[in-house]
């Protein structure tokens, strides 16, 4: 069922009269995409316990294990509730990291997205030329995953801040079009 929900959210299939758009700009507007992302975040919690054990990560920490590229395509799952990012290769959890998402007045959008563009160093045009190392944009409004201050609580203007070393590694294994699931 989980795989069906994820596939529907990515392919733009219509179910029970609700359209699920594959367009990243509208993905956050669909209930199905938000539910698929929330389900992916819930499953990631379970997978993390199985892969890395129960010890919680402190802000700025991450775990990464070697998983062969033959295991499948990459996807990123963001849990806003847990302030965590997860990288999968196929159905195998590769990495887990703490994040800092958007604060209450500038929330990170939830839903199913894909990486639209990447740049190793970007400077915010909106927020005082702030550096955004290893930026991976998934929202046309300029929301991205990037390296930045990571207090372990929502503190950004909507972006997903990652620890520097994790952001760099993640940048090297994702491509334009890599799915990004952002949920509770």
Describe the role of every protein-language-model region.
Residues 2-134, 141-184:
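N-terminal pre-domains immediately preceding structured catalytic cores
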């Amino acid at each position: 069922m989980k795989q069906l929900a994820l596939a529907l959210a990515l392919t733009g299939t219509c179910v029970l009269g609700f359209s699920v758009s594959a367009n990243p700009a509208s993905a956050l507007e669909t209930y199905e995409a938000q539910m698929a992302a929330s389900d992916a975040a819930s499953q990631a919690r379970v997978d993390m316990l199985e892969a890395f054990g129960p010890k919680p990560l402190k802000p700025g920490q991450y775990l990464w294990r070697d998983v062969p590229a033959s295991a499948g395509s990459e996807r990123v799952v963001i849990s806003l509730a847990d302030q965590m990012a997860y990288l999968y290769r196929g159905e195998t959890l590769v990495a887990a990291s703490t994040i800092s998402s958007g604060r209450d007045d500038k929330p990170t959008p939830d839903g199913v997205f894909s990486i639209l563009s990447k740049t190793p160093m970007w400077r915010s045009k909106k927020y005082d030329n702030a550096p955004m190392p290893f930026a991976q944009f998934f929202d046309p409004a300029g929301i991205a995953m990037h390296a930045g201050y990571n207090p372990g609580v929502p503190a950004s203007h909507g972006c997903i801040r990652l620890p520097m070393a994790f952001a760099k590694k993640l940048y090297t294994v994702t491509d334009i079009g890599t799915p990004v699931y952002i949920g509770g």
